[in-house]
Structures are given as C-alpha cells and as structure tokens.
C-alpha cells in the first residue's frame, strides 16, 4: 500500500514524534509507514488521516 504521510506531515510542519503521539503509536511506527514497510490497521489509518486533516483516500492508495 502506498501512502503520502510524509508529504502531508511535512506540509503541516509536524514531526514524526508529534504525529505518533497524536495517533497513539510509537515514532518507529510512523517511520515504517512512511517507508512503506508497514500497512496500518484501519483504525490507525483513520487516526492519521484525521490528524493530518486529509481524506483517507488522498493519504493511502493501493498502487
């Protein structure tokens, strides 16, 4: 699954640590997500989309 987490996170000026804290995960989880090494649960994907103020379909794609 491809994601645009880093793009939108940096656009908002949010660090990985800040996003992790707001989403309720460790910073390493955000690192793995951004590197494409981990696919989030639906709950985590929704939490991240909410914190980044981006519709989930703009944040994640199957291609």
Task: Kindly give the residue locations of the regions a language model identified.
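Absolute protein N-terminus
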Residues: 1-4, 63
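Short basic helix-loop element that most often maps to the first helix and adjoining turn
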Residues: 3-21
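Residues in the recognition helix of alpha-helical DNA-binding motifs
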Residues: 8, 22, 33, 62
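Short, charged recognition helix plus adjacent turn
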Residues: 11, 50, 61-63
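Key DNA-contact positions within bacterial/archaeal DNA-binding proteins
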Residues: 17, 28, 57
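Recognition helix of helix-turn-helix/homeodomain-like DNA-binding domains
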Residues: 25-38
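DNA major-groove recognition helix of helix-turn-helix/homeodomain DNA-binding modules
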Residues: 43-58
